[in-house]
UniProtKB/Swiss-Prot annotation:
Region (GPR motif): 253-255
Cystine pairs: 82-135, 165-249, 191-244, 196-207
Subunit relationships: Homotrimer; disulfide-linked. 2 Ca(2+) ions bound at each subunit interface in the trimer hold the trimer together. Interacts with the intermediate capsid protein VP6. Interacts with the outer capsid protein VP5*.
The protein's name in its UniProt record: Outer capsid glycoprotein VP7
Domain of life: Viruses
Organism name: Rotavirus A (strain RVA/Human/United States/M/1976/G3P[X])
Length: 326
């Protein structure tokens, strides 16, 4: 009996000794692996190009302000500025390096040369068909033309506001505008719009629904049309659909990353009289025009004051986003 107890105690002691040996061996192996791994990291760290993911950014303050990355020299937080101008400006200046000159001048106002983009357009009508405003801040220069006041006003209304639009099937349905913010916007190479208001029996008011020649014509061969009719009244429409598309749109509010600058003209365009414009102020301004160099110098000089009246938080705009924005 005593022999069995001694054997049991001896077996237990041997097991404890073996377990202790195994644990010490594992500890030495793990220490070797960890120290070797740390040694490799220490050796390779000077050779690695680390990236700081905003550790040194302040908690408060404007995120539009450029901060320098602690491990890189370039500016990684910056705003982009697009300047849209008519092609006649470049023709008059007639200098292949004029954009580089302006970029250097913008640099004196705190705008890096890589953040300024120059985009030309042929005329107001063609620009209105396919506006592309992709920068954080967009300045649109429109030279005043007394014969194009309506086109300039409609383009400004389109650019300075956000719109929610849906397609219209004018061959199958009647349409009505629900309130002042509800407009029909047409774009294309040639848009002719005719309307026929209907009474509660769907009979034409002053027109025949079966004869489009009796419809009232509200636009003729235009590239951009913002149609406003009597609210709450159904209308049958006739549109040159082969050269024009029409959408049922709702004005949502200001597009704050766009400013329209009228170049020259004794009359200043004003779209704030529209009751759907709220607040009754818009990012529209006028600069005197003698030569285009003078215009661009003025823009550079006042660019920061102009941008202060804007916000880069608005959505970008092109013709597709304008039609299908959700």
């Amino acid at each position: 009996m005593y022999g069995i107890e001694y054997t049991t105690v001896l077996t237990f002691l041997i097991s404890v000794i073996l377990l202790n040996y195994v644990l010490k061996s594992l500890t030495r192996i793990m220490d070797f692996i960890i120290y070797r791994f740390l040694l490799i990291i220490v050796i390779l760290s000077p050779l690695l190009d680390a990236q700081n993911y905003g550790i040194n950014l302040p908690i408060t303050g404007s995120m539009d302000t450029p901060y320098t990355n602690s491990t890189r020299e370039e500016v990684f937080l910056t705003s982009t500025l697009c300047l849209y101008y008519p092609t006649e400006a470049a023709t008059e200046i007639n200098d292949n390096s004029w954009k580089d000159t302006l970029s250097q001048l913008f640099l004196t106002k705190g705008w890096p040369t890589g953040s300024i983009y120059f985009k030309d357009y042929t005329d107001i009508a063609s620009f209105s068909v396919d506006p592309q405003l992709y920068c954080d801040y967009n300045l649109v220069l429109m030279k005043y033309d007394a014969t194009l006041q309506l086109d300039m006003s409609e383009l400004a209304d389109l650019l300075l506001n956000e719109w929610l639009c849906n397609p219209m099937d004018i061959t199958l349905y009647y349409y009505q505008q629900t309130d002042e913010a509800n407009k029909w916007i047409s774009m294309g190479s040639s848009c002719t719009i005719k309307v026929c208001p209907l009474n509660t029996q769907t009979l034409g008011i002053g027109c025949l629904t079966t004869d489009t020649n009796t419809f009232e014509e509200v636009a003729t061969a235009e590239k951009l049309v913002i149609t406003d009719v009597v609210d709450g009244v159904n209308h049958k429409l006739k549109v040159t659909t082969d050269t024009c598309t029409i959408r049922n749109c709702k004005k949502l509010g200001p597009r704050e990353n766009v400013a329209v600058i009228q170049v020259g003209g004794s009359d200043v365009l004003d779209i704030t009289a529209d009751p759907t414009t709220a607040p009754q102020t818009e990012r529209m301004m006028r600069v005197n025009w003698k030569k285009w160099w003078q215009v661009f110098y003025t823009i550079v000089d006042y660019v920061n004051q102009i941008v202060q009246a804007m916000s880069k938080r608005s959505r970008s705009l092109n013709s597709a986003a304008f039609y299908y924005r959700v």
